[in-house]
Amino acid sequence: MGSLPAGVSREGNHLLTANVSSVPTLAEQLGFAADDRVVIINCDDLGSSNAANTGIYDSLRHGLATSASLMVPCPWAREAAARYRGDDVGVHLTLNSEYDNYRWGPITHAPSLLDGDGGFPRTVEDVWDHADLDEVRRELSAQIERAILWGFDITHLDSHMGTVQLRPEFFDIYLDLAVEFALPLRLSGASTERVVGFPFRQLARDEGVVFPDHFILVTGVGSRRAIERAIGNLRPGVTEMYVHPAIDTPEVRSFAPDWASRVDDHHLMTLDTELPTMMKRAGVHPIGFRPLRDLQRAGA
């Protein structure tokens, strides 16, 4: 996903509109008990590199991961499409290209979304300061439509680096696309909502858009300990965690300063022998985003 703006929390939770027994929780609507702990483990940055594609599909098919998010504008997105087998994959809506030596840009004619290098801006703030909102809407819609054209059964939307979630005028587009394509969203929690100063969770709820109750980032070398803590502290409801798996190659080492963290995430998802047992003992129920999408489309 990349870095969020200063002061914005990566984790938190949202409270459902009503906590009365007559209103089913999201978990209950998905067929679980109200006090069950349900977890989506999403792999961000599918399509960003061959190393990411290999690590993410391995994590989905042979590991603990339950969903992934595709960066349509990236050079390796077509290869990700060629390797797709009906996995739970959403669109990682992308308006930034954060690396110095590896660049990508819009798939539509969008001059306001280009920086001096001919790619997307490196920072979230640069997008916020210079992007034309009509160009943003066209670009993000085109990213979703291209993923569908490539054959992906899109399960959800989320935002690379949080760019389209954390400002009201950009969030309006994010929410409109979720309604138009009938897709659930990744949304940060209450602490982030207080920082950014607008009620994005309630706005999504009012439009019938489904989103997980809680949101946690697990990142950095040694992320196993972070996941252990997260599992031990899970609240009832649906929690999304996201990671960035990649295999260790010269490619990923050449462009990603955090390559070691990404390799560690792949090991965590596929090679750790204790974590699956820990999750089972904790009564954690893994799911992808597809059940949330189907719930939203059913009008629940």
Protein language model regions, located:
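N-terminal pre-catalytic segment of deacetylase/amide-hydrolase enzymes
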Residues: 3-40
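Active-site beta->alpha N-cap acidic-glycine motif
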Residues: 27-98
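Structural preference for beta-strand elements that scaffold enzyme active sites
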Residues: 38-40, 65-69, 86-92, 154-158, ...
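Catalytic domains of cell-wall/extracellular-matrix polysaccharide-remodeling enzymes
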Residues: 133, 138-210, 217-225, 232
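Active-site gating loops and adjacent loop-to-helix segments of metal-dependent hydrolytic enzymes
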Residues: 100-128, 253-260
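Acidic (Asp/Glu)-rich catalytic clusters
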Residues: 56-62, 77-90, 103-115, 148-149, ...
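C-terminal domain-boundary segment and adjacent tail
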Residues: 255-300
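Active-site beta-loop-alpha junctions enriched in small/polar residues
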Residues: 44-46, 71-75, 92-96, 160-162, ...
